[in-house]
Amino acid sequence: MTAAASTLLLLPGTDLHVSRLCLGGNRFGSALDESESFALLDTFAELGGNFVDTALVYADWVPGVERSCSEHTLGRWLTTRDCRKAMVVATKGGHPDLAHPAGPRLDRASLRADAHASAENLGGAPIDLYYLHRDDPSRPIGDILDTMETLVDESVIRYYAASNFSADRLAAAAQYASASGIGGFVANQLEWSLAAPKADRVAPDLTYMDAGLLEFHRTHRLPVVPYSAQAKGYFEKSRSAGPIPQSVERYDTARNARTAQLLHRLADEYETDATALALRALIDCEIDIVPVVGCRTGEQLRRSWSCLDVSLSPSDSELLTSLTLSH
């Protein structure tokens, strides 16, 4: 199980060579049982994928499932397939306690506990890439980065990254890392797709790509690993007759409808589908972007993966890329 070299991206500041799509694992062990999860992971590896995303809390909100079932399921797959060295595993910690959501958990004790728990769930340390799942703006950024450096020094994790941080906090982290001579964040994960959600449908502790964040990434060249990169299937679902499904209602705007129409027209020309084109547009941006894709079946995954085979004309590439940068 090795990823094709032509589809790999070296994350700057690391030795991690990752596939241009990352497989999201939020359904592992819950909406997808273990057999279905293994089958999806097998398909991903066969296609050339090697970058998998999970989190300590994934599916902990689902009644009756194993706690941290996504990590546990991924860990069992890695062991069963004997492919740990071939994969780049990313997980996240520091999420507020779902049972008692009293606020952020980026204190040293909580981060250490989460990182060690994730390493055990995934089959052993070190974790390739460890995201801070939520920010705590009240905590000095240096305190957070110092904790992460300790985890690197102890070989619990190899590299660390941000998730749902503001541009100001990312800039402060970059400044602290430079002044301290440490690596700092090597990636940022936030919501980003060609379909911007309605402003009132973005939770206050989540982050969607905006002008300030985009300028930060342009300046600092920090890679983006966006979640909801397929807009939860909005572009395909919006083509169906009848009302917009509730699952994608947050994207039901006139702007997104126009984008969907354009994608469907181009998809017919390129003999692909709208979601694949939307992913291609992200990958073709001026900054390094590795979209996280969420799929239920191997066929859905193959359709998403087909974006890597799409070769857009310069004018179409410029047009679609402009849509990703104009929210």
Set out the residue ranges of the language-model regions.
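N-terminal binding-site loop/beta-alpha segment at the start of enzyme catalytic domains
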Residues: M1-A86, A229
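Acidic (Asp/Glu)-rich catalytic clusters
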Residues: G13, A45-E46, W77-V88, A119-G123, ...
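Active-site mouth loops of central-metabolism enzymes
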Residues: G25-S35, D97-A109, H133, S138-R139
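Short, acidic/polar
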Residues: L32-F44, D107-L122, A171-Q175
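Short beta-strand segments at enzyme active-site cores
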Residues: F51-A55, V88-T91, P126-Y131, A161-A162, ...
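A short acidic, helix-capping loop that chelates divalent metal ions and anchors anionic groups
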Residues: Y58-V62, P96-A102, A196-D200, R303
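Active-site groove signature of glycoside hydrolases
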Residues: A119-P140
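Beta/alpha (TIM)-barrel catalytic core signal, keyed to glycine-rich beta->alpha loops juxtaposed to Asp/Glu
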Residues: D135, R139-H327
